[in-house]
Every structure is written in C-alpha cells, then in structure tokens.
C-alpha cells in the first residue's frame, strides 16, 4: 500500500485582501514552526490578488506552506478579460490550483468540458490541479451521488495521460455540506472517496489509483477532522470557512495531535 502524504489545504474563497493574507500566513507559519510537520503538507488557495504577497513571504522566509490559486483560465493568454492564465500562476510559483470548485460550476456555469480544459492548462504549466467534484443535495437524496461524482471525475480527467493523472489531487466536496455546517458523515465521505479511487483504477491502474490523494471538503472543522482523516481513502481536507481562522486551521492541520 502506497503511503500518501495528507494534503491539508485552506480555500480562502473571496476573503482576505493582500495585507490580511500576509498577516494570516505569518500566523500560520509561526504556529506551525515549533514542530516538524513534514508528515502533512499544508497549502493555502488564495485570491489572485494575494498570490504575489504570499509568494514573497513564503520565498523570503522559506516557509513550508505551499500556495495556489482558486481557478485558472483554459487559455494561455489573449483577449479574455478578467481571466488569469497558467503562465501567470506558474510565474508566481504556485504549486496548486483548484479546478471545478462547485462555486465555479454553479455561479460561472463551468461544465466538465471546461473543467477538463482547465485541468489540462494546469498541467501544461507545471501546476497541480485540485479537481473538485461532488453532488448537490437532490442528487444525494435520489441516491445518485456516487454515479454523479464519478462522472465528474471521468469528465475532468478526460484524455489525460497517466503521467499527469498520477499527481492530480481530487477533492470530494458534496455541495450540500459546503458552508452549511452540515458535514457529510465520515462513512459517507469514505464511500465516495473509495469509489473515486476505484474509478481511477478503472481509468488508469490500481497502482496509479493508490498514489492519488483524495481530499474531503465541506464544513471541516477541528472537531470533525480527525474522524474524517481516519478513513482509509481520505488523504486530506479542503477547508473553506474554518481556514480563515488561523488558530482553527492550525488545529485542523494538526489533526493527528487530537
Ligand atoms: O468549499 C469548500 C472548500 O473548497 C468547503 O467550504 P466550507 O469548509 O466552508 O464548508
């Protein structure tokens, strides 16, 4: 069995200006400095306007915190007003980029085709995509959550070579659990994450599937993270609201101490 380093990532969404971002990352770095946290990878997904500040801080202080963006254009450049390209994110030395977050799918009509194009754009420029998938409440209530989520995984990874797919991070985020305080039960999250790994084995190989990190996201807090992280197919958390409170996020990162 492959060991997968847990990835604990904070998705700040549209919060924290660049000055607040600096203060926040400094607090995280300080709180995480007293112990060696190599066993867990920590990342923040910041608004575009914060990335340069975060980069300067991380580079300057040689912080172990990784950072990335919350979206990427499918295009490399040109007349796409308001968009941010892969080359721009690569220049800022981003490690990660979230692709297909449910808020992008919902408010910006991102289809699996668009998400797939963005996943490819991320790889083209050396960024690791965090492919976000997950069902709405009506889909879960109808019992179609696994099928729905696996279709998003397949659509997002379409035509992607194994050399690329093996480094993808997949975030299972049931839409009804995002920002609602309704956490998906650990067993329910495990069911879908195991199914995602099964789909990767079917699309590529069991060996590749065993390497891919699958995160859970949706109302993760310090109080529920340990139970979620104890599940065999859950390799990290994508944390929204609770990642804006540095003390709380540090507790989430240190779930093993609980
Ligand atoms: O969407 C999420 C992370 O990407 C989850 O958000 P919350 O943790 O606020 O529910």
From Swiss-Prot:
It is found in: Cytoplasm. Homodimer. Keywords: Cytoplasm, Gluconeogenesis, Glycolysis, Isomerase. It catalyses: D-glyceraldehyde 3-phosphate = dihydroxyacetone phosphate. Substrate binds at residues 11-13, 179, 219, 240-241. The keyword Kinase does not apply. GO terms for cellular component: cytosol. This is Triosephosphate isomerase. SUPFAM superfamilies: Triosephosphate isomerase (TIM). One of its GO terms (biological process) is gluconeogenesis. Belongs to the triosephosphate isomerase family. Its main location: cytoplasm. InterPro entries: Aldolase_TIM, TIM_sf, TrioseP_Isoase_bac/euk, Triosephosphate_isomerase, Triosephosphate_isomerase_AS. Gene3D superfamilies: Aldolase class I. One of its GO terms (molecular function) is triose-phosphate isomerase activity. Involved in the gluconeogenesis. Catalyzes stereospecifically the conversion of dihydroxyacetone phosphate (DHAP) to D-glyceraldehyde-3-phosphate (G3P). It is an enzyme of class 5 (isomerase). Pathway: Carbohydrate biosynthesis; gluconeogenesis; Carbohydrate degradation; glycolysis; D-glyceraldehyde 3-phosphate from glycerone phosphate: step 1/1. The active site is at 101 (electrophile), 173 (proton acceptor). Its EC number is 5.3.1.1. PROSITE patterns: TIM_1, TIM_2. CDD domains: TIM.
């Amino acid at each position: 069995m492959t060991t997968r380093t847990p990835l604990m990532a904070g998705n700040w969404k549209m919060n924290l200006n660049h000055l607040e971002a600096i203060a926040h990352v400094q607090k995280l770095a300080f709180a995480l400095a007293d112990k060696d946290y190599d066993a867990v990878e920590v990342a923040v997904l910041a608004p575009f306007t914060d990335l340069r500040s975060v980069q300067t801080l991380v580079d300057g202080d040689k912080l172990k915190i990784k950072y990335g963006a919350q979206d990427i254009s499918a295009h490399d450049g040109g007349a796409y007003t308001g968009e941010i390209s892969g080359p721009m994110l690569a220049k800022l030395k981003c490690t990660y980029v979230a692709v297909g977050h449910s808020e992008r799918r919902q408010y910006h009509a991102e289809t699996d085709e668009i998400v797939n194009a963005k996943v490819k754009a991320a790889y083209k420029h050396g960024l690791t995509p965090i492919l976000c998938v997950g069902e709405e409440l009506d889909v879960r209530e109808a019992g179609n959550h696994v099928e729905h989520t696996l279709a998003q995984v397949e659509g997002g990874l379409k035509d992607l070579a194994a050399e690329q797919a093996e480094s993808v991070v997949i975030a299972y985020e049931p839409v009804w659990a995002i920002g609602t305080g309704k956490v998906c039960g650990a067993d329910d999250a495990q069911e879908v994450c195991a199914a995602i790994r099964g789909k990767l084995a079917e699309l590529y190989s069991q060996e590749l599937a065993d390497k891919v990190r699958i995160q859970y996201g949706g109302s993760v807090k310090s109080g529920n993270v340990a139970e979620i992280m104890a599940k065999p197919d859950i390799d990290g958390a994508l944390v929204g609201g609770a990642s804006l409170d540095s003390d709380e996020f540090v507790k989430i990162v240190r779930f093993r101490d609980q």
